[in-house]
Amino acid sequence: MVTLRKRTLKVLTFLVLFIFLTSFFLNYSHTMVATTWFPKQMVLELSENLKRLIKHRPCTCTHCIGQRKLSAWFDERFNQTVQPLLTAQNALLEDDTYRWWLRLQREKKPNNLNDTIKELFRVVPGNVDPMLEKRSVGCRRCAVVGNSGNLRESSYGPEIDSHDFVLRMNKAPTAGFEADVGTKTTHHLVYPESFRELGDNVSMILVPFKTIDLEWVVSAITTGTISHTYTPVLVKIRVKQDKILIYHPAFIKYVFDNWLQGHGRYPSTGILSVIFSMHVCDEVDLYGFGADSKGNWHHYWENNPSAGAFRKTGVHDADFESNVTATLAAINKIRIFKGR
């Protein structure tokens, strides 16, 4: 008897919902065109009405990063028009951006940037990676995997691998740590001094902090003439040319100005990865950021938990960057998984 009542209640609920939705859509359609009961026309009208209902949402995720008017703090900082990747079409830097970028890692006599970029795009494609272009509808889930020791014994691996995109950075290994950090990598952010060998299908995103960084990537896949920047670097790398992407210097400045408010000398690869992902993804989850549960700052592949010299260089403001990501999580723009 109880089962019959539950079944009856479900049927009645479904009928009421169906009548309400049908009435709503028909009334809405009536204001646009004369209502017709031809099946094909009905489907078209319902489809158009659904599009109108969801058009104000930039994605189909529970929380869409690009959705505005939910946080004044976010709206003041997030600028969707700033392009994260350098291409042949957007390669010209404004003077103030160029002067600022030249100061990040000073060179004695940097070569002409325009000539360097022209040579760069003779060797690598000068187009945006089609994978990274935002879709009009959908939910692109991305994992940004940092290098914190809090990933050890976290068992996040399968969860990380379930994302559409998995972004890693610098010298981060996966071999030997698969259970905690996963095996999947779609994009890997590096600069010449932090490069590591990548998988065949991994897109390399070069983060250039100086002119020679752009020259190095050309050299490393052709002549192999550059072996030193401010420290020895790999002479040759094995990366497919169509898998090489360049982080836009103007986007680095955008992160520094808008998100870091001028804190630190320039942004870390970690925060650059986070803001980059917010511009190409609909939903972003962070793993391996911050200290472990004991307050130690170290890399997950290191056996010395008390390490953490990277926080003491004076180049990056780790505390301010951490506050930015914490605020983004508090307003439901990203999620942070803190591990152990």
UniProtKB/Swiss-Prot annotation:
Glycans are attached at N79, N114, N201, N323. The chain crosses the membrane at residues 14-34. Pfam families: Glyco_transf_29. Disulfide bonds join C59-C64, C61-C139, C142-C281. Pathway: Protein modification; protein glycosylation; Glycolipid biosynthesis. InterPro entries: Beta-gal_alpha2-3_sialyltrans (IPR051757), Glyco_trans_29 (IPR001675), GT29-like_sf (IPR038578), Sialyl_trans (IPR012163). It is a single-pass type II membrane protein. Residues 1-13 are cytoplasmic. It comes from the Eukaryota. GO terms for biological process: ganglioside biosynthetic process via lactosylceramide; N-acetylneuraminate metabolic process; protein glycosylation; protein N-linked glycosylation; protein sialylation; sialylation. Its EC number is 2.4.3.4, 2.4.3.2. The soluble form derives from the membrane form by proteolytic processing. Residues 35-340 are lumenal. One of its GO terms (molecular function) is beta-D-galactosyl-(1->3)-N-acetyl-beta-D-galactosaminide alpha-2,3- sialyltransferase. It catalyses: a beta-D-galactosyl-(1->3)-N-acetyl-alpha-D-galactosaminyl derivative + CMP-N-acetyl-beta-neuraminate = an N-acetyl-alpha-neuraminyl-(2->3)-beta-D-galactosyl-(1->3)-N-acetyl-alpha-D-galactosaminyl derivative + CMP + H(+); a ganglioside GM1 + CMP-N-acetyl-beta-neuraminate = a ganglioside GD1a + CMP + H(+); a ganglioside GM1 (d18:1(4E)) + CMP-N-acetyl-beta-neuraminate = a ganglioside GD1a (d18:1(4E)) + CMP + H(+); ganglioside GM1 (d18:1(4E)/18:0) + CMP-N-acetyl-beta-neuraminate = ganglioside GD1a (18:1(4E)/18:0) + CMP + H(+). Substrate binds at Q105, N147, N170, Y230, Y266, G270, G290, H299, H316. A beta-galactoside alpha2->3 sialyltransferase involved in terminal sialylation of glycoproteins and glycolipids. Catalyzes the transfer of sialic acid (N-acetyl-neuraminic acid; Neu5Ac) from the nucleotide sugar donor CMP-Neu5Ac onto acceptor Galbeta-(1->3)-GalNAc-terminated glycoconjugates through an alpha2-3 linkage. Adds sialic acid to the core 1 O-glycan, Galbeta-(1->3)-GalNAc-O-Ser/Thr, which is a major structure of mucin-type O-glycans. This is CMP-N-acetylneuraminate-beta-galactosamide-alpha-2,3-sialyltransferase 1. It comes from Pan troglodytes. The gene is ST3GAL1.
